[in-house]
Amino acid sequence: KSVGGTPLFFAKGKGSTIWDEDGNQFIDFCNSWGPLIHGHANGYVEEKIIQTLRNGSSFGAPTRLESELAKLIKTNIPFIDKMRFVSSGTEAVMSALRLARGYTGKTKILKFEGCYHGHVDSMLVKAGSGLITLGSSSSAGVPETVANETLVLPLNDENMLIQTFEQYGNDMAAVIIEPVPANNGLLLQDLSFLQLLRGLCWKH
């Protein structure tokens, strides 16, 4: 009810195509928020899933396949020093923010309007009413004391970004951004904005 309208219920998918319960056909640009980069019902992927399931469903402990995947990721993205596998994007963000706060001893997080980072309390925050303001809760159940630790800025506003770092830079544990944000109609950031943000992060 909170988002309005009637949600689509999907019945099946094949490749890049999905069908809803009424038989309407869509191109799937979501890909289950990332994991389905090979599309729906991919024969090779299905075969590997079945092969793996025959050796057990879930162990709740590390496996050889996790180590092999970690090595593959490291080979293709060599600047990654450490990695951790989790069950959802929300857990990944939650872990990253906790690590940043623990390592820096700082508490504030900077995020940007329209970017989605899971159901972490400190990410369910919208911009306040002032020019540079602490965030306010956008979801019932998120205390304002938690929301107040999150700064929220509009995308591509370089002046506000500079002002925010001047005011809060020494209190920030981390900055989180979605370079290709699906929830705001793919409002892409300017390269100069991202470069400025990267430089400010290194500086502070």
Predicted features and spans:
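PLP-dependent aminotransferase-class I/II
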Residues: 117-180, 188
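Short, acidic, Ser/Thr-enriched surface-loop or helix-capping motifs
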Residues: 20-21
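Active-site-adjacent loop/helix segments that line or gate small-molecule/cofactor pockets in enzymes
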Residues: 1-12
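Catalytic PLP-binding core of fold-type I/II PLP enzymes
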Residues: 171, 187-204
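A glycine- and small-aliphatic-rich helix-loop capping segment at beta-alpha/alpha-beta transitions
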Residues: 101-106, 125-132, 192-196
